[in-house]
Amino acid sequence: MNPMTNRRVAARLIAGCTVLAAATAAWSADVTMRISHQFPPAHHSAKNLEQFAADVKAATNGKVDVQIFGSAQLFKPNQNHSAVATGKIEAAAIVGFTLGGTIPEMNVTLIPYYVTSLDKMKKFPGSEAAKLLDAKLLDKGLLNLGWMVDASDGIFTSAKTALVKPADFKGVKIRGLSKLFDEGLIAMGASPSAMPGSEVYQALQTGVIDAGFTGVAAAYERKFYEVQKFGVASNIILAHDILVVNPAWFNGLPADIRQAIQTAAHKAEQRSIPKSADISAEDVKNLREKGMTVSVLTPAQEKAMAEAMQPAVLKAFQASSPDAQKLIDLVNKL
């Protein structure tokens, strides 16, 4: 190889290294979006978030690396709010009603048999009611990207006898959801203890509580059938998992990246809405196949439960915030 050829090869190598360095620099500038959540891998919301990550990757041509940390690996459920708001992590999926102590209005969908129709579920995201709540979340350092339905139903599980009518709850130590929802349980004579879904199985197993409450699908995913004999399902509440991000982090992203993430969040939101307001026959079947005796309340039985629970919960909600009645009026318009 002559000197001229050597110089040409060297020039090409230098040019190639320059391109590689530029590509490496560009890659190092890519966005990392870490999401913390409490759900086990089999949980439907965990699977929805995995699809969200895939959608973001596809939409951004791999420029955004969505890293998901489920099963409370990084933060406990009650730590996610602070972690996102202070920038310790970019994002989290939080069960909305768990923020009810900080933002009382987040409990509105826990009013028994109130926001559980399929029509209201479809209309809620993007509604004036949702916008009011989004504004309150932003005031607390959380930018909400989506309202993912966690459960549009609920199942009371028990070991000794099925909890079918209000009188069956008298004296029962039961998993509560929030101070607000628990007013309805207290009205029926139960003794609720609020706790995250991740803690319920052990509480049932050790006898800390007698009865559980969760979504029908979650009862299967969290293996309640191993520690409970009976399950009574109904369209009692609407629970959302909100996908929240740190506002400063999100607003600092390029516009196209923000749009891709928001679009993927909207898809996750839409995927989460059930096809029917009926209790999933598949979810009931799954529990029955594991040996649990499961029944679904009739409309008349739901009415009896609503009459026993709703007045106390509604009264507590109206007293919880100056904006409570405004929110109720907005939900009534859905």
Task: Show which residues each predicted segment covers.
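N-terminal signal peptide c-region/cleavage motif recognized by signal peptidases
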Residues: A23-T24, S28
